[in-house]
From Swiss-Prot:
Belongs to the bacterial ribosomal protein bL35 family. It comes from the Bacteria. This is Large ribosomal subunit protein bL35. The gene is rpmI. GO terms for biological process: translation. Residues 1-40 are annotated as: Disordered.
Length: 66
């Protein structure tokens, strides 16, 4: 049976760490920033770890070779 292809949209959105955790960009920074405080905007920087169950689903269905 051939290998499953990785979903190209997931390649751009998720990164798997060496320990198997799935990292993703923080949500909520596309629009509507004018009504947020500087502290709120600053805290949205960087990446976060997905919950284990969500990360397992991402690896199973979207990143099968990770």
């Amino acid at each position: 049976m051939p290998k499953l292809k990785t979903k190209s949209g997931a390649k751009k959105r998720f990164k798997v760490t060496g320990t198997g955790k799935v990292m993703h960009a923080q949500r909520g920074k596309r629009h509507g920033m004018i009504k947020r405080t500087k502290k709120q905007i600053r805290q949205l920087r960087g990446t976060r770890v997905l919950f284990k169950t969500d990360g397992d689903n991402v690896k199973k269905y979207f990143l099968p070779n990770a």
